[in-house]
């Protein structure tokens, strides 16, 4: 669920009421979903298009510092509702996430447009490394 807010302060102070979320999901007949709060308010310390946070306790993630899977659809949402305007058939959006939890990330969302449709979305960026490992078969 995408929830636009008016300011970075509102994003930073947002708290998820999980009981209310579960009630909404139950009333809609769906499983628990994540909640992505964001603002388009510019920041003084960065040039991000979007400042955001993602809450997904139903997936075992109280807060995610870099949600690539939610960022692509966010880009489509921003274009659909006129918050971002493509230039020459492309839009580039930068989402700053994870700041509140001390793990700032910068997610780049590149959107290709053709005939008013979105045939291509690419997501990449930078995140804080908190661990790494190797998986060996067998």
Residue ranges and their predicted role:
Residues 1-138:
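Active-site proximal loop and beta-alpha junction motif in alpha/beta enzyme cores
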């Amino acid at each position: 669920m995408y929830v636009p807010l008016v300011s970075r302060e509102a994003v930073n102070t947002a708290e998820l009421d999980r009981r209310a979320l579960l009630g909404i999901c139950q009333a809609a007949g769906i499983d628990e979903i994540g909640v992505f709060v964001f603002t388009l308010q510019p920041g003084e310390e960065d040039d991000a298009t979007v400042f955001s946070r993602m809450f997904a306790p139903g997936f075992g993630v109280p807060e995610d510092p870099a949600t690539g899977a939610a960022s692509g659809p966010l880009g489509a949402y921003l274009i659909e509702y006129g918050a971002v305007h493509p230039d020459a058939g492309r839009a580039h959006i930068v989402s700053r996430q994870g700041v509140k939890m001390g793990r700032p990330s910068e997610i780049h969302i590149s959107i290709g447009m053709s005939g008013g449709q979105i045939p291509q979305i690419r997501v990449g960026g930078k995140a804080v490394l908190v661990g790494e490992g190797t998986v060996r078969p067998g």
